[in-house]
């Protein structure tokens, strides 16, 4: 066998071995399955109990896994993450504004009772941001940034589960859940941080509840007429 043949054999061997995932990937996928099972089993209604549940299963469990095995779940803040957070939040804000005018959305939100009184809405808003942080830690942190070694395709790991978790919400929200998951995952993947999706999601939830508690900023008839092509009730 010549030196050239040896080199070719080595290159082929490297190509066969390189794509094999590390044990961390298996741990992430196993933990992800256990966590979503706990999420389905542990039902809550009020915001307080919801926060306890989500912070335990969506934040504490992935956090313990990352600490135990030295994995990365996107808990990082740097200049790139801050820039992308601002850009993503600015991009999705109009969708929340338009969505706040839809009858099905206004009938569902706020998901937890609140008013615009500062003493009531402020703690409500903090709760929403924490809910968003918990969700992003699991869906985009554990199941996207945590699977970065799989390449860009890791953004496709969680959309189906994320969409299923929106069952029972307004149909238009369920329709957009999958694409939103992919968008948020792609930005977080390229940022190496869940800050962009956390800011966009948290700010969006607060903005949506604020707008729903007020008169529509855009005439609903105009919005309904422009979106009548969508295949879901609005």
Regions found by a protein language model. Give the residues of each.
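Short, Lys/Arg-rich, polar N-terminal cytosolic tail immediately upstream
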Residues: 1-20
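Alpha-helical transmembrane segments in multi-pass membrane proteins
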Residues: 18-70
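Membrane-interface helix/loop boundary segments of multi-pass membrane proteins
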Residues: 134-157, 186-193
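Membrane-interface helix caps and helix-loop-helix hairpins in membrane proteins
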Residues: 43-49, 164-172
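Functionally important transmembrane alpha-helices
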Residues: 38-40, 44, 173-231
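Juxtamembrane helix-loop-helix connectors linking adjacent transmembrane helices
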Residues: 46-50, 70-134, 145, 149, ...
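Aromatic-anchored segments of alpha-helical transmembrane domains
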Residues: 32-41, 92-100, 159-167, 203-212
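Hydrophobic alpha-helical transmembrane segments
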Residues: 29, 82-86, 121-125, 153-160, ...
């Amino acid at each position: 066998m010549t030196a050239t043949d040896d080199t070719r054999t080595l290159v082929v061997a490297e190509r066969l071995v390189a794509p094999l995932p590390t044990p961390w990937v298996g741990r992430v996928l196993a933990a992800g399955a256990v966590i979503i099972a706990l999420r389905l089993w542990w039902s809550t209604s009020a915001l307080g109990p919801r926060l306890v549940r989500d912070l335990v299963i969506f934040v504490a469990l992935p956090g313990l896994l990352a600490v135990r095995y030295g994995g990365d779940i996107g808990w990082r803040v740097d200049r790139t993450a801050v820039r992308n957070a601002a850009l993503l939040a600015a991009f999705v804000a109009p969708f929340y504004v338009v969505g706040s005018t839809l009858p099905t959305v206004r009938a569902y939100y706020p998901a937890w009772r609140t008013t615009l009184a500062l003493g009531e809405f402020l703690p409500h808003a903090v709760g929403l941001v924490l809910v968003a942080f918990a969700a992003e830690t699991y869906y985009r942190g554990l199941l996207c940034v945590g699977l970065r070694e799989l390449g860009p395709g890791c953004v496709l790991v969680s959309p189906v589960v994320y969409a299923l978790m929106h069952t029972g919400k307004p149909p238009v929200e369920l329709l957009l859940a999958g694409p939103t998951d992919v968008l948020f995952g792609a930005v977080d993947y390229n940022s190496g941080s869940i800050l962009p999706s956390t800011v966009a999601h948290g700010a969006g939830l607060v903005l949506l509840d604020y707008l729903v508690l007020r008169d529509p900023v855009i005439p609903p008839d105009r919005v309904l007429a422009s979106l009548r092509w969508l295949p879901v009730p609005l």
